[in-house]
Amino acid sequence: MAGASERDAGKPAASGAGAVPKTKGRKVQGGRVVESRYLQYDKKTKKVSVAAKGEKPPTEGRKASTVPRSREESKVMGTSNLQSTMLEGHGLNPPDLDLSAIDDKSMSRKAPQLERSVAGTDKSTSLLRPDQKRTLRKKRRDLQETMDMMESQTLLMTLLSVKVENNLALLEEKAEKDLAAMCHEKERLQRQALELRRQLLLRQKHQELAAALDAQTEVLSPLPPVLERFKEEYKTLGRALDTTRHELSMQAVHMEGSGQELLDDLEPALRTTLQLLGDLSICSPEDSAQVQGASTQQPGASAQLNCLLKELKGLVAEKDLELCRLVSQVVELSSQASKEAALTNQEVWEEAQGTLTSSQGYFSPDVRKDHSPTQDRTNSSSLDP
């Protein structure tokens, strides 16, 4: 029942913003009337709120209408706890209250800027003519359509962006596969290029070797006659060495005693050899008879012969070793003589042919350019024994 009392108490507020309640100046019969605290509001706030809404202050004897005058006013007021309670409690009959004077907490929570904009819009709407109102409604409808269109376009753009992302992922995967294939192909081509380069370098080297061989063949083409003459001279040198082998000087060979002592030591061995050759019917009978006569004249000749045979065997072994050493020395001397003969023939040929002709057989064209006659004389002097 508190709502009914509040409704009854709120009716005198419709007399105006500057009106004083009538209960103060009149005597109430039949009881005492207590002033409601609900009506203790700030008069200045009420005037400002009424002026902001563009309404005329209510006069005495006329009740102010509490029904919202437009959709904007209902939007501005919102749904407060007081209004919802009254609507739920009384159904379709709204209370006859001036809600403009109520200091509602839900209204105070709204931003001041929004209140000013909505108040200005309501005021301008209430002051416009009908054609201007229609234009304003049309603009609002156009604005709503534009917003709907922008929302639909935003949705389409979102769908397109999702589709683009999916396509981009597929393209990235495909590009990675193509890139891997290209890398494998690049490696294969690099290996093939390296193999071809190696083959090319090998062919170039073979061509250079063939050119060098051709140049050497051209340089050595006049040498066969000289080679034949060298062979003949070498054979002559070999025959000369064979004929003069026993007259060559012996060096670095240790021999005890002189030549006569060696001959005296060889005499008994030669006699034993002569006897053995006679026994084998190789020696002449006279020599064998002389040996036998000498053996019969001297007593103990058989024992001496045995001793001589033993000595002969020892001497043969020693002479065999000495002959081996002598043969090795003779071979070494022969090689040195051949070397000296070859160097002599080479020097003679170089002097006969000249420096330029002889340098063609020893040096390449690049070396021949830097080769001077002074170096030729130095080389020839170093080759002389």
Swiss-Prot record:
Q: Which UniProt keywords apply?
A: Acetylation, Cell cycle, Cell division, Coiled coil, Cytoplasm, Cytoskeleton, Microtubule, Mitosis, Phosphoprotein
Q: Keyword Cytoplasm, does the record have it?
A: yes
List N-acetylalanine occurrences by residue.
A2
Q: For bias kind Basic and acidic residues, which ranges apply?
A: 1-10, 53-75
According to its UniProt entry, the protein's GO biological process terms are: cell division; centrosome cycle; spindle assembly
Location in the cell reads: Cytoplasm; Cytoplasm, Cytoskeleton, Microtubule organizing center, Centrosome; Cytoplasm, Cytoskeleton, Spindle; Cytoplasm, Cytoskeleton, Spindle pole
User: What segment(s) does the record annotate as region Disordered?
Assistant: 1-78, 107-128, 356-385
Gene Ontology MF term list:
microtubule binding
Q: Main subcellular localization, coarse class?
A: cytoplasm
What is one cellular component GO term in this UniProt entry? spindle pole
Q: At which residues is Phosphoserine found?
A: S100
Q: Show the ranges annotated as biased composition (Polar residues).
A: 375-385
Q: Which residues form a coiled coil?
A: 131-248
* Family indicated by similarity: Belongs to the HAUS8 family.
How does this chain assemble?
A: Component of the HAUS augmin-like complex. The complex interacts with the gamma-tubulin ring complex and this interaction is required for spindle assembly. Associates with microtubules. The interaction with microtubules is strong during mitosis, while it is weak or absent during interphase. It is unclear whether this interaction is direct or indirect. Interacts with EML3 (phosphorylated form) and TUBG1.
Tell me, in a sentence or two, what this protein's role is: Contributes to mitotic spindle assembly, maintenance of centrosome integrity and completion of cytokinesis as part of the HAUS augmin-like complex.
Q: What is this protein called?
A: HAUS augmin-like complex subunit 8
Query: Organism, per UniProt?
Result: Rattus norvegicus (Rat)
